[in-house]
């Protein structure tokens, strides 16, 4: 029995671009907004869909990164919006997030940190275990970014002259996403 399409409570808002059919005998036939909002099973279905999308993205990133990079510019606004809306989704896809640098190569956040002289999470954990008796302040890593390559070309040239790298953040959602990353990694 066809119940409805575009049920916002079943498909997370950031995944509304997905097309498909959900065959679920346990969904209630009464699809009023209040019935769906109060149904714990509907929440489980939405969480499961988010998890499966995150798993698929991670799988593509690990097994077919070249193809993943081809689609990244198209899917990144939705993934970044998903990270802002759903913390569990953000945690699952954090290692598959890519940032385009000034050479138009795609880097992960860990790669960006390494490229700018910072320490990765593994290096920081290893250092914490070896220096457990000393209290040591961790140096902050600056990652520079540009939002418009033409308008900010003088900064890009300056970065290149100094041997610095920066990431290109051209989507509208990137300003909110960068704020999210700064809060998450402080």
Where are these regions (language model features)?
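Conserved GHKL (Bergerat-fold) ATPase module
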Residues: 1-186
């Amino acid at each position: 029995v066809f119940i409805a399409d575009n049920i916002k409570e079943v498909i997370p808002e950031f995944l509304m671009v997905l097309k498909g059919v959900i065959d679920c005998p346990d969904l209630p036939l009464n699809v009023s907004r209040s019935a769906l909002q109060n149904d714990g099973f509907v929440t489980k279905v939405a969480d499961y869909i988010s998890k499966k999308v995150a798993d698929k993205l991670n799988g593509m990133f690990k097994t077919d990164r070249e193809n993943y990079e081809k689609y990244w510019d198209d899917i990144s606004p939705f993934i970044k919006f998903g990270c802002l809306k759903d913390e569990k989704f953000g945690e699952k896809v954090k290692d598959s997030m890519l940032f385009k640098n000034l050479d138009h190569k795609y880097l992960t956040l860990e790669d960006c940190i390494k490229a700018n002289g910072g320490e990765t999470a593994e290096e920081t954990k290893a250092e914490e275990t070896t220096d457990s008796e000393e209290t040591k302040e961790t140096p902050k890593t600056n990652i520079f970014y540009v939002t418009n390559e033409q308008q900010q070309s003088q900064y890009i040239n300056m970065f290149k002259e100094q041997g610095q790298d920066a990431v290109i953040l051209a989507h509208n959602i990137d300003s909110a996403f960068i704020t999210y990353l700064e809060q998450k990694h402080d």
